[in-house]
């Protein structure tokens, strides 16, 4: 539960910041990839951001945690995040 609240708050901060209410399509892709693709594929998708190895390792650590959630719970979280993104883009 704590992890989903953190993800929700981060998404709100990124999407609904006053200076830029437009969200980046890469954010949507990255969020959905985070919940639904395998760890090796996700690691490849993170390569496009050229993040430091420590950041990639941290993100993969969180992904390992969320991968332990049932697919149904991950789908519910993704659904809420998509709804938030839609509201932020209006």
UniProtKB/Swiss-Prot annotation:
Taxonomically, which superkingdom?
Answer: Eukaryota
Entry-linked InterPro entries: Secretoglobin, Secretoglobin_sf
Q: Does the keyword Signal apply?
A: yes
Instruction: Identify the stretch annotated as signal peptide in this record.
Output: 1-21
Q: Name one Pfam family in it.
A: Uteroglobin
Expression (tissue specificity): Highest expression was found in skeletal muscle. Expressed as well in thymus, trachea, kidney, steroid responsive tissues (prostate, testis, uterus, breast and ovary) and salivary gland.
For this UniProt record, give its keywords in alphabetical order, as a comma-separated list. Answer: Secreted, Signal
Localization, per the record, is:
Secreted
Main subcellular location of this protein, as a coarse class = secreted
Q: Name one GO cellular component term.
A: extracellular space
Functionally, this protein is described as follows: May bind androgens and other steroids, may also bind estramustine, a chemotherapeutic agent used for prostate cancer. May be under transcriptional regulation of steroid hormones.
- Could you say which protein family the record assigns here? Belongs to the secretoglobin family. Lipophilin subfamily.
Q: What is this protein called?
A: Secretoglobin family 1D member 2
Organism (species): Homo sapiens
């Amino acid at each position: 539960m704590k992890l989903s609240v953190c993800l929700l708050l981060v998404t709100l901060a990124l999407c609904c910041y006053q200076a830029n209410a437009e969200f980046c399509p890469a954010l949507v892709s990255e969020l959905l990839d985070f919940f639904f693709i395998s760890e090796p594929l996700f690691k490849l998708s993170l390569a496009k951001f050229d993040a430091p190895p420590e950041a990639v390792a941290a993100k993969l650590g969180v992904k390992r945690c969320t991968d332990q959630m049932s697919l149904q719970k991950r789908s519910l979280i993704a659904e809420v995040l998509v709804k938030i993104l839609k509201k932020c883009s209006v």
